[in-house]
Amino acid sequence: MMESANAILDQRQNCGVRKVLHIDCDCFFAAVEMRERPELRERPIAIGGSSDRRGVIATCNYPARTFGVRSAMATATALRLCPDLVLVPSNMALYREVSQQLMAILSDYSTQLEQVSVDEAFLELGRDEHASSVAEGIRQRVRNELGITVSIGVATNKFLAKVASDWNKPDGQFVIRPNEIADFMTTLPVRRIPGVGPALQKRLELAGIITCGDAQTWSLMELVRRFGRSGASLYQRSRGYDSRPIHTERVRKSLSIEHTFAHDLPNPGACLAQVSELYERWLTRVSRTPWKAESLAPFVKVKFADFTQTTVADIGESASEEGFKRLLQQALTRADKPVRLLGIGGKFPHTSEQQLSLF
């Protein structure tokens, strides 16, 4: 705990020194498709699988969002909300090409560049550079050279910059200046903190924590006792603290997705029936990274009703739907019990750095 307190003190002392930009493409996949097919610009479109294959929406444009369509939504649900929705097959080769062009533009402004995903990056500038002007220049270049738009947040650290980039979407920028952090954080809803999902948000609401200002009334010890590691992170983020550096060669170890079922799955057949939907959701997440699904070493995680769990991995297996099913069958032979949670994922090759995760 003393180490955490010292880290927070260091962040207070260093606050205002750094100039960090978070660059986030606006509905990237859809934007690239609209660039290629201008006739789609005014129509609601989504990148995703067909409804008869239990597909999942990877992203959609803003006209589609007015109907309630969202990323990670089942395609069948999206079509019910918007019957005129145009489904466009993904073109990952093209998206990666545009992503590389984007990173090339960003690298012109600083060597301190961290690519977070295919459509997102952090950039740190020198102390003497005018961050707002740089952000405006980047947005103009991306618009003119790539035919898409980005939104940019500017702040003293990565967390605040990421929050800021979502403030004036699309094709906008927002600056959180050092002397504005305290007031800004007081009114910021905790749900706007990256990593606070619906489950944690509900727990926080039950504790009376709606805004970051509410969280600031809790001591570090109280938050840790109530929320564990999430409480320690919340203590720092609710005050706008984040000492993470820019990782110029950031490498993830793995990418996975899990689902806890409202009712335990009673048998292997019921478990195997869930793989298709999990796989589609996992592919959506993989598509937002620079990697291809087939290059990942697959693994399956099973948590049984009694909270025991097992993981099966096989570097010789393919990271395909059928490959995950075969691994799941192996895992289920290890215990004859109902299942409460299933997870699938893939390990990236030759990685050693831990994933960065807030919660």
Feature annotation, model-predicted:
Residues 1-226, 232, 343, 350-355, ...:
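Gly/Gly-Pro- and Ser/Thr-rich, intrinsically disordered tail segments characteristic of DNA damage-repair
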